[in-house]
Amino acid sequence: MNREQAGKALVLIPARMASTRLPGKPLADICGLPMIVQVARRAAEAEVGRIVVAVDHPEVFAAVSDAGFEAIMTRVDHQSGSDRIHEALLKADPQGEAEIVINVQGDLPTIEPGPIRAALKPLENPSTDIATLTVAITDEHEKTNPNVVKVVGSPLSQSRFRALYFTRATAPYGEGPLYHHIGLYAYRRRALETFVSLKPSALEKRESLEQLRALEAGMRIDVEIVDSVPLGVDTPADLDKARRILSARA
């Protein structure tokens, strides 16, 4: 990341109250703070740009604002996280000053600053439309687990490759590493605007992976390799683990 990128980047954190496995997830207490505030704090530690939380409930709006972070109310009926991010972008930056949009998921309260910064690195190449992250798989079970999204790509360097496909299947075939995709994205503003204007694609619907819409439309996604998968909080057990991690850091 260079200074020019940092000055033109906007970090958007979507926070959705309607979680089936963990109702009220953004407000879940982690070490005395709502989870969404912990995520905003982690994003602030990365020092990559202005931070805005895209919320869909007044209680979350109040929690974020009370903690000193910027919140924007968005619709509750968005079909995807990208649509919510786009609405928040238009409201937060109507003048179009932010050239890069970083989407940090609102259920990553323990994420380190490093991966957030790493997501910007592929955008140093002006040909890259979207950047994202991945980790080499070391657990054999993950290779066949459809809930672990794999990314298949063409190497650009030891730490980066160009995405050719994302899949829930075990791929690619043969000897060599497999990679676990991390759903943290950095978009060029124009790429996000193009993406949300497209209809869901055939492969996107088949795999239930919206990033395939971008690939099918000919957009370029480059992937930075990082060391570990951040904990996503989806269940009460995940929440307990996040509490232990942040308590140990205190």
Curated annotation (Swiss-Prot):
Q: Name one GO molecular function term.
A: 3-deoxy-manno-octulosonate cytidylyltransferase activity
State the family named in the UniProt similarity comment for this chain.
Belongs to the KdsB family.
Q: Which SUPFAM superfamilies match?
A: Nucleotide-diphospho-sugar transferases
Q: In which pathway does it act?
A: Nucleotide-sugar biosynthesis; CMP-3-deoxy-D-manno-octulosonate biosynthesis; CMP-3-deoxy-D-manno-octulosonate from 3-deoxy-D-manno-octulosonate and CTP: step 1/1; Bacterial outer membrane biogenesis; lipopolysaccharide biosynthesis
Pfam family for this entry, one:
CTP_transf_3
Q: What protein name is recorded for this chain?
A: 3-deoxy-manno-octulosonate cytidylyltransferase
**EC class (word):** transferase
The principal location of this protein is: cytoplasm
Tell me which Gene3D superfamilies the record gives: Spore Coat Polysaccharide Biosynthesis Protein SpsA, Chain A (3.90.550.10)
Per the entry, what this protein does is: Activates KDO (a required 8-carbon sugar) for incorporation into bacterial lipopolysaccharide in Gram-negative bacteria.
Which cysteines form disulfides?
none
Reported EC number(s) for this entry are 2.7.7.38
Q: So what does this thing catalyse?
A: 3-deoxy-alpha-D-manno-oct-2-ulosonate + CTP = CMP-3-deoxy-beta-D-manno-octulosonate + diphosphate
- PANTHER family from the entry? 3-DEOXY-MANNO-OCTULOSONATE CYTIDYLYLTRANSFERASE (PTHR42866), 3-DEOXY-MANNO-OCTULOSONATE CYTIDYLYLTRANSFERASE, MITOCHONDRIAL (PTHR42866:SF2)
Q: Which CDD domains match?
A: CMP-KDO-Synthetase
* Organism encoding this protein: Sinorhizobium medicae (strain WSM419) (Ensifer medicae)
Record has Nucleotidyltransferase as a keyword: yes
> Which key words are in the record?
Cytoplasm, Lipopolysaccharide biosynthesis, Nucleotidyltransferase, Transferase
Q: Name one GO cellular component term.
A: cytosol
Compartment(s) of residence: Cytoplasm
- GO biological process: any one? CMP-keto-3-deoxy-D-manno-octulosonic acid biosynthetic process
